[in-house]
Amino acid sequence: MSKPLRIVFAGTPDFAARHLAALLSSQHEVIAVYTQPDRPAGRGKKLTASPVKNIALENDLPVYQPASLRNEDAQQELAALKADIMVVVAYGLLLPKFVLDTPKLGCINVHGSILPRWRGAAPIQRSIWAGDEETGVTIMQMDEGLDTGDMLTIATLPIEPTDTSATMYDKLAGLGPNALIDCLSEISAGTAIAEKQNDELANYAKKLNKEEAKIDWAMEATAIERCIRAFNPWPMSYFAVAEQNVKVWHAVVEAENQGKAPGTILSADKQGITVATGKGALRLIELQPPGKKAMKAQDILNSRREWFELGTQL
């Protein structure tokens, strides 16, 4: 029989907030919440609280927002809470050894991949771009490495051919909380089994950058289409035409590139704008010109057909 645990929760974005909400509905006691300091957001650059902070305040939980946990005062503040365990979900701060060792049962982390594959900052995006057929969440006992701790629970789900990083994020945000509650029950009951990661199978999901988002038409159409889904909603794949960057929200793979050079426009009609690639072709269905909302190909052709004349090289 598991007993309630005294939990310190550390997290920042909506993904983390959903895990905090699940903990608040469980038998366990959340005694404090750590989250990133408020950041400027929106056009007015107004200081804005994180989704995790908002939930914590709604539930009258103490909130701590240190800029770093390497500070001795911050560490002593954490130690004074006398937590059984610290649950970390997309917190955004490195935890030094003192912090990892402070809770009675250490710190556990919810990571958005099937470890040891895709350790690091962008596991959801990298798994889609790589063409992985499944992903999931791994709950691990944290150590000083980057996502290298022993694995306690793994929950998986398929990556569908239409999934974007946005849809996958939502799916994992639904999968993770249940896995977390199950894991905590096992930890509390003393039945959790920790499995070491096989470092030989590990790879790293480095942060995305805008330079990667520029479409390379020399790649295979299937790889470009995965890239478009992986980079949705940020930073969004794009191509340049008439010295303007046009974002691509949705595209489908076509088998035939008509023997044309990569980047050549093969057709442009209400079905989409078809572009030759290194292997096959890509039909662009939904696009976003600068300063505009996303629109169907037909709509952009109505206003900018000169950008997409047949034979034009992107």
UniProtKB/Swiss-Prot annotation:
Functional summary from the UniProt entry: Attaches a formyl group to the free amino group of methionyl-tRNA(fMet). The formyl group appears to play a dual role in the initiator identity of N-formylmethionyl-tRNA by promoting its recognition by IF2 and preventing the misappropriation of this tRNA by the elongation apparatus.
Gene Ontology cellular-component terms listed: cytosol
Protein name: Methionyl-tRNA formyltransferase
SUPFAM superfamilies assigned: FMT C-terminal domain-like, Formyltransferase
Record keywords: Protein biosynthesis, Transferase
Family in the record: Belongs to the Fmt family.
Residues that, per the record, bind (6S)-5,6,7,8-tetrahydrofolate: S113, I114, L115, P116
InterPro entries, sorted: Fmt (IPR005794), Formyl_trans_C (IPR005793), Formyl_trans_C_sf (IPR037022), Formyl_transf_N (IPR002376), Formyl_transf_N_sf (IPR036477), Formyl_transferase-like_C_sf (IPR011034), GART_AS (IPR001555), Met-tRNA-FMT_C (IPR044135)
